[in-house]
Amino acid sequence: MVAPPPARQPLLAVDDLVVSFDGPLGTYRALNGVSFHVDAGETLAILGESGSGKSVTVRAVMALLPRHSARVERGTIRYAGEEISAKPVRRTRELSATEIAMVFQDSLTALNPVVRVGQQIAELFRVRQRLSRREAWQRAVAGLDRVGIPNAAKRAHDYPHQFSGGMRQRVVIAMALALRPKLLIADEPTTALDVTVQAQIMDLLRELREADGMAMILITHDLGVVADVADRVAVMYAGTVVESGPLREVYDAPAHPYTRGLMNSVPAPDRPGTRLTPIEGMPPSPLHPPTGCPFHPRCPVARANCRTDRPALRIVATGHEAACHYAQEVMTGVDTVKGAA
């Protein structure tokens, strides 16, 4: 009998990650058991509204949580099979300099305002690859040219404030990709950019990802952006992943009421004239989270057990998971439990 091939090892795997913060009003959990994985060469979109824990998740991966107010209570983070969450922060920072890179929301604060952009990129090559000043500068100019900065040799001498928002974000992308990372984390990379520039930046990220064969985690609340670039999607709500799976499966047959609510709350070209249905209520306060399923106070299909029993992620189809007691009903669109007490 021929043994089955070994399962492919994810490039990044996060399991049961719990992160707490100490604030002026008390201690609260920003992440409550987050689990997901990213395979080499794929794009995972982490989708959710503001405050769902998307950015905290990736900052935990990058070891960028504030030291004095945040702490990881439990969970593991593995990169290429190595458990980096158990290693000193220095090891994670080493990986973030060479293997994992991040594009932040605000390009202006991501760059040093008093250092020329070419010098900021060249410094990466000098420190990490021990290149000469001349060669490092040439690499920096080539990187700016690669991301579409016109007249890159001249613009490399400019300071961040001399670039428009869209061009400044291209500089940040050039810096992130300078050392050819295997994983790029893009945290709301088009925030504060106009619609046309947003599309240009997302097209650029997609082209560069395909050219370099790297994996990408895209943090966003925009369903349209996810549909354009992602292979898989993880939906977050109240500090946990409530659904994950292949993009088309999650979009075509969402298995969690929150995901279905997101789909029904935005216009869809294939449903002209369809009335939009907002999700009722507000996200829970992290200081006073609900018992049971975190979505039950807003859920149209909640039953009594949803108020007491927290559902775990379970498989509903190949590669498709949802944290809902009634995932099958939600997937088929049959509201058999709506209004049940």
Regions found by a protein language model. Give the residues of each.
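P-loop NTP-binding/switch modules centered on Walker-like glycine-rich loops
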Residues: 63, 185-189, 193-274
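Conserved ABC ATPase "signature" region
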Residues: 82-83, 135-154, 263-264
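Conserved ABC transporter NBD signature motif
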Residues: 72-83
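Short catalytic/signature loops enriched in Gly
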Residues: 4-10, 150-154, 244-341
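A short, flexible loop at the N-terminus of ABC-type nucleotide-binding domains that lies
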Residues: 7-11, 20-33, 64-70, 87-92, ...
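The feature captures the beta-strand-to-loop junction immediately N-terminal to the Walker
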Residues: 47-49
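A short, proline-enriched helix->beta-strand linker immediately N-terminal to the Walker B motif
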Residues: 178-182
